[in-house]
Amino acid sequence: MRLRKCVPRRRSVSWTRFVPGRSRSQGAHQKDKTAARTAPTGLSGLRVVDFSSMFMGPYCSMMLAQWGADVIKVEPPHGDVVRYLGDERNTGMGPIFLNANRGKRSISLDLKRSESSEVLRPLLGKADVVIHNFRPAVEASLRLRGTDVLAHNPQVVCCAFRGFGTSGPYAGRPAYDDIIQAASGMASVQGNGGPPEYVRTVAADKIVGIMGLAAILGALVERASTGSGQLVEVPMFETMASFMLMEQQGGWIFDPPEGADGYVRTASPHRHPYPTKDGYLSVMIYTDAHWRAFFEMVGRTELIDDPRYCSMRERTRNIDELYALVAAELVGRTTGQWQADMEARDIPSMPVNSITDLFRDPHLEAVDFFERVNDRTHGAMRYARAPVIVGKAPSELRPTPSIGQHSLEIARELGLSQRRIGHLTQVGAIGSQATEGLV
């Protein structure tokens, strides 16, 4: 599938608002739902073509959609495999997919068929951003390498999520969240001296997705100055190694090392939510003022000037003793009693929420964190809104699309005739839910 070079006529969108010093001010979250429907959002006018699947790329493009970008999800005829994970009301619309792909449009293309290039060429030509997580051999076979895409559209930002950087010996290896948690040291740290353990969420996928978002926005800032696009590679392994080493490198920042790796406080076996009389409480007694207030609160004022605990350096050296002391104190009273006393003394603390507790959290309720919608296909639903609002008001997002829900709409926008769309649908190059009136 060859792509002819296409230098698109740029839409009248000024991306100088991303240049430092020229940014629009970020508005507060607006409760006025009418304003939310009509006000422009930070990325309005940005077109994103997203070939990625699973978690990492879709999480990145979901955030772009939440900030107002027009995200077009390109799916194979069978759809993204994540569609089929978890409980569902309708086939192919599982909860993870619903969350990660809200606000996007879906076009179904069989990229292995040469005819699909009739849609792919203009789609890439009108894109501001292209996202994919193809392995190098696959992107080469589909002619979707960064060089291919940039040759076709020199102004596009092409974000390629990789398992491993392409210049190293691991290039081209398959990678998933578990693999990268293991390779990056995250699983080892979770094991805390025992058998390694995975973090019980797709941490690497989501962290790398956020790094991809930052890389895309940085490339758009540069494009605002130069007018040129670029290939941005976001490797999972290198990203997570950097993420872990920030505080875990320890004495190994020196060459030769001046001590052990790791961060003593986070490695303490006593660092965990503390049992109370009726549950658990997370407490972060950190500064000199925090510890003084805590010792006074529990009647241990003799420890305030104890040389083992009078400075952050010494407390870190004796952190196991301190955490054990806190644990022994907290077990005697209820979570609510402790939290009230700690809040009065400005000591950071929070009860331990389950996932379902979040839906009843009074703070999240007060900030309208959950958007409740009545979807005509799925019925009543609730979504977590964007935690950060860019622009004057949050956008009202499209519902999560079914496979190829917008194929015909997008093909028409790209200038294909009704007859040609009908032919491409008949031969299987385009997949769509609607075929009426195409031939």
Feature map (PLM): residue ranges:
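Mid-to-C-terminal alpha-helical segments outside catalytic/metal-binding sites
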Residues: 2-18
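N-terminal helix-loop segment corresponding to the beta1-alpha1 unit
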Residues: 18-225, 402, 408-439
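Glycine-rich beta-alpha junction loops
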Residues: 78, 163-165, 236-241, 278-280, ...
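Conserved Rossmann-fold dehydrogenase catalytic segment
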Residues: 166, 193-203, 224-240, 260-266, ...
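Mid-domain beta-loop-alpha active-site segment that forms a flexible
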Residues: 202-217, 236-244, 286, 290
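Oxidoreductase and adenylate-handling cofactor-binding alpha/beta cores
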Residues: 209-229, 242-252, 295-301
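Aromatic-enriched alpha-helical interface/lid elements that frame and gate functional surfaces
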Residues: 269-345, 349
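A glycine-rich dinucleotide-binding beta-alpha-beta segment and adjacent secondary-structure elements
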Residues: 344-397
